[in-house]
């Protein structure tokens, strides 16, 4: 496919964690703190929900389900864990979709960010690392996360110590995710005497995600209580 392989391989990078971190940091420190916090909530709570669903559904990647599917090598390197729902689409929706929400009155920015979300989702299908349902479900979940976090942050700001409630809830859910990751049963399928997908490799994504989420919310609560960065 030539140029399209190259182009969409770069587009899909906009749904990776590094781009998310850089964007959140830039917006938080330089553009607008409240907008940065909104993006951070979208990203971290979005990947928390996404990971719960991934290890619950345990759906294999397309090339595992059908040997006729051959993704590009570069895309496969970042396609870790189970397939459903799409993590890249979740990240793209949380960051670029979040920016579309915050800059809704600017039509150019709004539609540019929305198009970027859709392009990342399409790139996951084009590069053959996700099925359409992986992308669509992740997109729908992401929209609910965008809406829910607007309500959640508004609720936090209108009451005393509600930030502690949210922080405690996040710690509890993270602990549940780790316990669930360790204790649940995972499918083990064989082909020609070999394990198709090693469950241990599929579950490793839970741990760094939990550590990132705890670290981010710890920084958030410390800022609210002691630093109050303007």
PLM regions with names:
Residues 12-13, 37-42, 82-88:
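Short secondary-structure transition/capping motifs
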Residues 7, 23-24, 28-30, 47, ...:
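Membrane-embedded catalytic cores of phosphoryl/pyrophosphoryl-handling enzymes
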């Amino acid at each position: 496919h030539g140029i399209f392989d190259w182009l969409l391989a770069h587009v899909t990078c906009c749904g990776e964690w590094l781009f998310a971190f850089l964007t959140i940091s830039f917006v938080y420190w330089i553009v607008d703190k409240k907008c940065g916090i909104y993006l951070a909530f979208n990203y971290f709570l979005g990947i928390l929900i996404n990971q719960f669903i991934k290890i619950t559904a345990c759906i294999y990647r397309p090339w595992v389900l059908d040997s006729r599917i051959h993704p590009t090598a570069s895309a496969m390197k970042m396609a870790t864990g189970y397939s459903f729902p799409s993590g890249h689409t979740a990240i793209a929706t949380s960051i670029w979709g979040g920016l579309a929400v915050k800059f809704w009155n600017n039509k150019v920015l709004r539609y540019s960010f929305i198009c970027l979300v859709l392009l990342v989702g399409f790139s996951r299908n084009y590069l053959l690392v996700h099925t359409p349902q992986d992308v669509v479900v992740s997109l729908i979940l992401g929209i609910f996360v965008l809406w829910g976090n607007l309500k959640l942050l508004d609720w936090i700001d209108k009451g005393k110590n509600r930030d502690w409630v949210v922080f405690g809830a996040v710690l509890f859910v993270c602990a549940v995710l780790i316990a669930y990751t360790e204790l649940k049963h995972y499918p083990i399928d064989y082909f020609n005497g070999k394990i198709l997908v090693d469950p241990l490799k599929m579950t490793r994504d839970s741990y760094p995600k939990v550590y990132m989420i705890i670290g981010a919310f710890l920084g958030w609560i410390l800022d609210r209580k002691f630093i109050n960065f303007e």
